[in-house]
Amino acid sequence: MTVQERWVELADIKDELAARDWFPGTSGNLAIRVSDDPLTFLVTASGRDKRKRTNEDFVLVDATGQLIGEQSGKPSAETLLHVEIFNNTNATCSLHVHTVDNNVISELYAAQGHVTFTGQEIIKALGYWEETASVRIPIIENHADIPTLARAFAPHVTGDAGAVLIRNHGITVWGETPAAAKRYLEAYEFLFSYSLKLRALGVHS
């Protein structure tokens, strides 16, 4: 696909997630693979209001996350997370959002380093079809220094689809296709919201 086709594909996903209010305060970032040899990808430009759609929403970067040629914006702060994903998997798209639910879940389960969900129907959206299927999401500590954060993130990038929670920060989800990445993100956020609603009722899932 061309850069422009990938741009439109990522912009459409951004619009959908923005409609859910998943980009508070210009937070979050999205990326989509454009080419493999050499590796290039589009990533959210830093500081953009993702509720608006403009011609400067994304920038094109290389395998190290550096801008390719002259562009008006600069890559999002967490571009190195997408660098890890695209250099080490065949994923096409990765999505990073900061929601209240994923931040609260990451804090509640930070001490054990992961959160596990079992037996929920929505887990099928992640590709697990057994009635008692479980999904485990690793939780890593947040680091203001992005290279340090990327090093903590890297060991969990082990397949073409996955997710990592960053404590009191957000979730990064990636998938084989843009549609898959969005579906996975929606499923994880459903699980987080469901779990927190049960807790509010005094029931622990």
UniProtKB/Swiss-Prot annotation:
Binds 1 zinc ion per subunit. Pfam families: Aldolase_II (PF00596). Catalyzes the dehydration of methylthioribulose-1-phosphate (MTRu-1-P) into 2,3-diketo-5-methylthiopentyl-1-phosphate (DK-MTP-1-P). Belongs to the aldolase class II family. MtnB subfamily. Its EC number is 4.2.1.109. Zn(2+) binds at H96, H98. Keywords: Amino-acid biosynthesis, Lyase, Metal-binding, Methionine biosynthesis, Zinc. The keyword Transmembrane helix does not apply. One of its GO terms (cellular component) is cytoplasm. Gene3D superfamilies: Class II aldolase/adducin N-terminal domain. Disulfide bonds: none annotated. One of its GO terms (biological process) is L-methionine salvage from methylthioadenosine. Its cofactor is Zn(2+). NCBIfam families: PRK06754.1 (NF005244), salvage_mtnB (TIGR03328). It catalyses: 5-(methylsulfanyl)-D-ribulose 1-phosphate = 5-methylsulfanyl-2,3-dioxopentyl phosphate + H2O. The keyword DNA-binding does not apply. SUPFAM superfamilies: AraD/HMP-PK domain-like. One of its GO terms (molecular function) is zinc ion binding. HAMAP family: Salvage_MtnB. This is Methylthioribulose-1-phosphate dehydratase. Pathway: Amino-acid biosynthesis; L-methionine biosynthesis via salvage pathway; L-methionine from S-methyl-5-thio-alpha-D-ribose 1-phosphate: step 2/6. It comes from the Bacteria. It comes from Exiguobacterium sp. (strain ATCC BAA-1283 / AT1b).
